[in-house]
């Protein structure tokens, strides 16, 4: 075990030395050509930004939020292919509800409802070109699908007025002159007579407007009519009688897009807030060392990386999704974090060194730290690229590319800015009025004395902080807090709900929300339809063919939560009696009557349930006449997604028993139910892979067993808190929250890696000195970074939408937990555990000419072992060992 630890330590030392030397060399090169570096990086960003000419926004909830390997996606494709010969489907749902919440079957409400239905069918028109079109103009063979409501309301009104009883308006289906009309898909919140099942009240009525389009012109006509319908429903908001609601796949996509559009202008507000914060927290009293302009360019740096990364992806043909809207906010916060670390490292370099040396030393100091955090962020997001959900894939591609560009621009663009800033410092130019010279002070001034007092106060605060960390009672206090925290978070993880509903994609004031909530609370409970596609019917003339189909139908009619035969739509039920009429009593299946049957007005609606081949094949009684067909039956009392998934799996299992018929089931909302199949295992595997990658990085850069175990435990603890808090913040596990969890993993490692790296690399024999050195070196930049990130993200709290609020809540949470673990928990744990580090010789500053011209770095000495508070110490005892400690602390305080 000791040899493995020693080997890891040697590997880490070699990586540390090579990384240090590489960044030192890069710093020298940038210092040699700062203006060329700025020019090249800026031009590249502008060239890539030209990719906006290929910008294409897409937004389809079904396509982008369902996994590519989910059963529902295949089932949807089968359904689309079935209707493809007719054209592409267009579907809008309109619901009517009494303004006072009462029954719609009261006389004046029925009149109003019929008036609305007639208006929507014939009088509401959308314009295209020089013509206007109503629904009746483009519905074609689908017009009858919206007739059930008008038939029911008209007959109910006539029955109330004339007191006739020749038609019984029963529920869930009624018989109209020999034709059964199923009402449970249109009439909801029904009160019936317990004896006769006759409908007495109904508080909600839904009308389904179906149509088929075959070309882009027809699609545009329907979309225009849909927008007119949407505008009309908004106008009924204050109607004294009836409130009208509408939803459709197209309107849902538009609402999701509206969320993104509303968030984008806030990017400007975020930029100004971050700019002000960055400038104010990097100002110094010394007008030469202060860096307001550099801070401004530091905030511009992530903007350039966004232009370059987004443009690059647009050039490559990637499409933009609304969920990508939050990427600029995240990259701005990540990029500004690196600016604080860079400026902090610059101020720690000796002022008397040349600009060239200072840049090399700055990059050698800050480069590895920034590399670790950038690598962890990149890996946590890049792993999401392999998830099967397109929305997560697209989000992760955009943010991963942006992280790479941000890292490159921080290393090159901002380093070049610091070089020019250093040249200004050398020339003693004013940071605010850079054309003015600032004379050297001849003697200490009052302000400088005051600055020394401030430094002393900060030093005392740091000492108090370290005293708290080193105290025994603090370990018991934090231990009790952490145990309580883990218990509550573990409980939250066990209770987290899974699933995405369409209402989570809307703004809180979306006009679609009322109907979506009615669907969830009322329609899902009272009615739904499952369609069964028979893709390979075979020879229906065989004696066992039709009986087998009817047995399958019966199995679905009596399955769990099924309504029964009253809800069934099966074309064979009217067709077989028709064949009997033609055959004078025999009802054996015949193909030759199919074309004639579907042309008859009373049976025309059944033509949508079959795919016929060549008509001549039908006349010749060939099985190729009937290529496919579909039937459907109703179900109810399936409100939760877990209940609906149980039904789906039961139906799929039944369908799988008939491989020779190639049965496929389809239900409109199966994409949401199927997320329970994929989101949990995908989240588990993705998070597991991300955590393994984080642990490998921490092991590579800080190979001490103490730092490996503690930092890994800290990352796990932070993420346990993030996962556990989801249930307390009313957030479910869905594709949206999954992307934020990937982000949380990367962010959590940032805080842990910074403090662990500074603790590990410190060459001190005292735990107190090592912890003090780590906190003095990174606490303030960590605070700046965390605060700036929260400022960047909390602006989005103005957007009242679940899709955006999830990011805000999780980012604020992970920053709070990360800072608490990084600045309090880990230092206390470090103070309680022994620490052993394989250490090479103290790094010697290499002269620029040696690094740049003389070739390789001088050979390192043999590694030594430093044991903090141990019994042995293989390094020579130094009587002046506290001197470097105090020197480091004073340097950190000056920064």
From Swiss-Prot:
Q: Which InterPro entries match?
A: Patched_domain-protein, PTHD_SSD, SSD
Which residue stretches does the UniProt record annotate as biased composition, category Basic and acidic residues?
878-895
Pfam families listed in its UniProt record: Patched
Task: Indicate the transmembrane segments per the record.
Answer: 260-280, 296-316, 323-343, 366-388, 402-422, 476-496, 688-708, 709-729, 735-755, 788-808, 810-830
The superkingdom of the source organism is: Eukaryota
Record GO cellular component, one term: apical plasma membrane
Q: Which residues form the SSD domain?
A: 263-420
Q: Which keywords does this chain's UniProt record carry?
A: Cell membrane, Glycoprotein, Membrane, Transmembrane, Transmembrane helix
What compartments host this protein? Apical cell membrane
For this protein, the record's SUPFAM superfamilies field holds: Multidrug efflux transporter AcrB transmembrane domain
What is its membrane topology?
Multi-pass membrane protein
Region span, Disordered: 838-895
- Where would you say this protein principally sits, based on its record? membrane
The post-translation modification note in this UniProt entry reads: Degraded in a lysosome-dependent manner before hatching.
Q: Which residues are glycosylated?
A: 10, 130, 194, 215, 539, 560, 662
> What family is this protein classified in?
Belongs to the patched family.
Protein task:
Transporter, which promotes the endocytosis-mediated degradation of hedgehog-related proteins such as grl-7 in order to establish the capacity of progenitor cells to maintain quiescence in arrested L1 stage larvae.
Q: What is this protein called?
A: Patched-related protein 18
Source organism of the structure: Caenorhabditis elegans
């Amino acid at each position: 075990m000791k040899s493995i630890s020693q080997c890891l330590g040697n590997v880490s030392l070699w990586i540390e030395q090579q990384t240090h030397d590489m960044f030192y060399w890069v710093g020298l090169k940038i210092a040699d050509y700062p203006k060329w570096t700025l020019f090249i990086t800026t031009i590249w960003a502008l060239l890539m930004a030209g990719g906006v000419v290929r910008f294409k926004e897409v937004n389809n909830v079904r396509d982008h939020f369902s996994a590519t390997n989910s059963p529902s996606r295949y089932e949807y494709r089968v359904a689309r292919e079935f209707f493809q010969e007719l054209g592409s489907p267009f579907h809008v749902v309109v619901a009517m509800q009494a303004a006072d919440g009462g029954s719609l079957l009261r006389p004046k409400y029925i009149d109003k409802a019929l008036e609305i239905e007639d208006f929507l069918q014939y009088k509401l028109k959308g314009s295209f070109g020089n013509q206007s079109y109503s629904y009746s103009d483009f519905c074609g063979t689908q017009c009858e699908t919206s007739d059930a409501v008008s038939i029911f309301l008209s007959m109910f009104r006539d029955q109330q007025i004339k007191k006739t009883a020749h038609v019984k308006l029963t529920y869930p289906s009624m018989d109209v002159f020999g034709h059964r009309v199923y009402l449970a898909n249109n009439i909801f919140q029904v009160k019936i007579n317990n004896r006769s099942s006759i409908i007495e009240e109904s508080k909600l009525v839904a009308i389904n407007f179906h149509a088929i389009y075959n070309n882009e012109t027809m699609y545009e006509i329907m979309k225009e009519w849909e927008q007119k319908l949407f505008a009309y429903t908004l106008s009924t908001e204050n109607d004294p009688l009836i409130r009208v609601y509408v939803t459709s796949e197209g309107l849902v996509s538009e609402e999701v897009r509206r969320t993104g559009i509303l968030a984008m202008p806030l990017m400007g507000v975020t930029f100004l807030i971050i700019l002000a914060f960055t400038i104010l927290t990097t100002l110094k009293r010394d007008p030469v060392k202060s860096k307001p302009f550099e801070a401004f360019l530091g905030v511009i740096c992530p903007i350039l990386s966004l232009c370059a990364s987004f443009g690059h992806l647009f050039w490559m043909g990637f499409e933009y999704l609304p969920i990508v809207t939050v990427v600029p906010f995240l990259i701005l916060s990540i990029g500004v974090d690196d600016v604080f670390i860079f400026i902090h490292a610059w101020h720690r370099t000796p002022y008397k060194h040349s600009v060239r040396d200072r840049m090399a030393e700055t990059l050698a100091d800050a480069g590895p730290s920034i590399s670790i955090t950038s690598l962890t962020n990149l890996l946590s997001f890049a792993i999401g690229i392999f998830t099967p959900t397109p929305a997560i894939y697209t989000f992760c591609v955009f943010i991963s590319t942006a992280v790479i560009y941000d890292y490159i621009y921080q290393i090159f663009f901002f380093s070049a800015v610091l070089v020019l800033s250093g040249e200004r410092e050398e020339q003693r130019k004013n940071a605010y009025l850079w054309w003015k010279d600032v004379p050297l002070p001849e003697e200490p001034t009052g302000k400088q004395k005051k600055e020394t007092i401030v430094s002393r106060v900060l030093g005392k605060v740091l000492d108090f902080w370290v005293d708290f960390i080193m105290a025994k009672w603090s370990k018991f206090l934090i231990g009790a807090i952490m145990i309580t925290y883990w218990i509550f978070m573990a409980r939250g993880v066990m209770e987290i709900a899974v699933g995405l509903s369409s209402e989570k994609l809307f703004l809180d004031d979306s006009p679609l929300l009322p109907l979506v909530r009615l669907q969830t609370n009322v329609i899902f409970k009272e009615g739904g339809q499952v369609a069964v596609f028979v893709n390979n019917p075979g020879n229906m003339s065989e004696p066992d063919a039709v009986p087998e189909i009817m047995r399958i139908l019966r199995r679905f009619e009596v399955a769990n939560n099924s309504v029964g035969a009253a809800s069934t739509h099966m074309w064979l039920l009217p067709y077989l009696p028709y064949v009997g009429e033609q055959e004078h009593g025999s009802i054996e299946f015949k193909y030759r009557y199919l074309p004639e049957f579907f042309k008859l007005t009373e049976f025309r609606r059944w033509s949508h349930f079959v795919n016929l081949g060549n008509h001549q094949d039908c006349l010749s009684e060939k099985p190729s006449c009937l290529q496919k067909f579909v039937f459907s039956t109703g179900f109810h009392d399936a409100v939760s997604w877990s209940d609906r998934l149980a039904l789906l799996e039961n139906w799929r299992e039944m369908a799988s028993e008939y491989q020779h018929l190639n049965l496929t089931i389809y239900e409109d909302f199966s994409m949401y139910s199927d997320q329970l199949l994929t989101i949990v295992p995908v989240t588990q595997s993705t998070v597991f892979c991300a955590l393994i990658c984080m642990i490998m990085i921490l092991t590579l850069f800080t190979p001490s067993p103490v730092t490996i175990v503690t930092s890994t435990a800290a990352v796990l603890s932070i993420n346990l808190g993030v996962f556990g808090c989801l249930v307390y913040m009313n957030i479910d596990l869905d594709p949206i929250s999954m992307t934020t969890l990937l982000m949380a993993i990367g962010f959590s490692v940032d805080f842990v890696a910074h403090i662990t790296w500074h603790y590990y690399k410190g060459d001190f024999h005292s735990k107190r000195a090592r912890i003090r050195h780590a906190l003095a070196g990174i606490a303030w930049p960590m605070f700046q970074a965390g605060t700036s990130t929260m400022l960047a993200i909390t602006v989005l709290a103005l957007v009242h939408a679940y899709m955006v609020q999830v990011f805000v809540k999780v980012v604020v949470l992970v920053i709070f937990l990360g800072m608490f673990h990084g600045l309090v928990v880990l230092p206390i744990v470090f103070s309680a555990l022994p620490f052993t580090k394989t250490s090479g010789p103290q790094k010697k500053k290499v002269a620029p000419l040696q690094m740049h011209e003389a070739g390789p770095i001088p050979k390192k000495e043999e590694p030594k072992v430093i044991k903090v508070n141990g019994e042995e110490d293989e390094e020579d005892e130094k009587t002046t060992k506290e001197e470097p400690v105090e020197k480091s602390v004073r340097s950190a305080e000056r920064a």
